[in-house]
Amino acid sequence: LVKAALLLVSDSAEQPLTITTGFPYSTYRIYKDMATEFLRKTHIIEFDASTYSNSGKRSVILDVQNVEVIPEIVGCTIALRKGEHQAEGNFFVLSCGFGTFESVLSMESGIVEQTMVSTHGLKYAVNMMMSELEKSHYLGFRNAHLMDEAFQKGYIILNRKNVDLREIRRNVLRSYYNEVISPNLRNVITD
């Protein structure tokens, strides 16, 4: 994915490049140095351009000089404060992704690291839905990402039948909130 992202900016970005990327707070310290080392270098990317033009195999050279690796939730906070909304004051930032749910208290002076929460994302609820469906349906080789798509749509085709997932989705989201989100937030939000 990183090479695909670099390829997408190759025609429009000035070199040397500066890259900012993020990891979930729970793993960001583990991977920060590795990611920096992997990204900060000259990248030679070969690709087949014939899928969208008449040219064949091409390559681009991209020089990455500066790399910043931050927790994803910090990136969310920066976007809220410096981006379009220009948020002010003290507030909690909640980020619910597929793999990770994160939250942090953001103050004018910065984030409060003791309020940082990093736990299971929506994949937890999707897996609960899969377990529920397996009780009455054969799911075959469907994985969590395919089920996530069905989770979002609210239906899935199983055994040539349209199965409505809205009630199951509502129940597993309620369970996900009660089992994962609420207990974790309760530890940092005491108002």
Predicted stretch roles:
Residues 93-95:
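Short hydrophobic beta-strand that contains or immediately precedes a catalytic carboxylate
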Residues 98, 104-143:
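Glycine-rich phosphate-binding loop plus the immediately following alpha-helix
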Residues 1-91, 110-124, 158-191:
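Nucleotide/phosphate-binding catalytic cleft detector across ATP-hydrolyzing
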Residues 69-73, 97-102:
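A short mid-domain helix/strand-loop element embedded in enzyme catalytic domains
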Residues 78-79, 102-104:
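Short helix/loop capping segments that flank catalytic or ligand/cofactor-binding pockets
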Residues 133-173:
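A mobile "lid/hinge" subdomain adjacent to the ATP/sugar-phosphate binding pocket shared
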